Amino acid sequence: MTSAILLVSKNRRKQLNDQVFQQAIALAFCSISVLVNTGIANQTVLAQPPKQQKCDIYAYVITKEPQGLNVRSGASPTHRILGKIATNETVKIVAASGKWVKITDITGDFKGTGWVYLPMLSISSRGYGTDGVNIYSNANQKSQKIGKVPPSTSVKLLGCQGEWAQVEYQGIKGWLASEDQCGAALTSCS
């Protein structure tokens, strides 16, 4: 009798273990499904390109590539190359999306509109005959003045917003007003 009880008990334990195992598998699949679906949803959101910022500034090409700067059909290095722009050519920036800017009004051989990698462009300060131009903390002249750029000095271009250029000069990151910008490499714009 005891061996019959033990056998029933072992069988019952096996059934319970099987049920627990099946429930654990079902729970694991549900958890994986939730994680995968949430991950896919998050990836879809993350895969969207950065929002475009409208701009209206001029800059010049500073690439060291002998063939010039690639102009692309979209805001990434995977987009088709439409043409090239030589170093020191002036371009008009009409939009920005992350580290890419949409350009037009190009002074060189390439005519049309396209996208270029922002770190390959620069601007200079105006202010000829003054002690320099102000760098502002935000894209408006009522914001705090956080630094100065000497006249006719090349600065690193970080971005743009309307007619304002986001720049970096000697570690100071801020904004240059449109009247303080020079988008031509070989002139002081005075």
Can you annotate each of these PLM segments?
Residues 75-80, 139-144:
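Short alpha-helix capping/helix-loop boundary micro-motifs
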Residues 77-78, 109-111, 173-174:
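Short, surface-exposed beta-strand-loop junctions and turns on beta-sheet-rich folds
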Residues 26-73, 84-87, 93-97, 105-107, ...:
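SH3-family beta-barrel domains
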Residues 166, 175-176:
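Structural recognition of the beta-strand scaffold that forms the well-ordered cores
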Residues 1-20:
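N-terminal secretory signal peptides that target proteins for export/translocation
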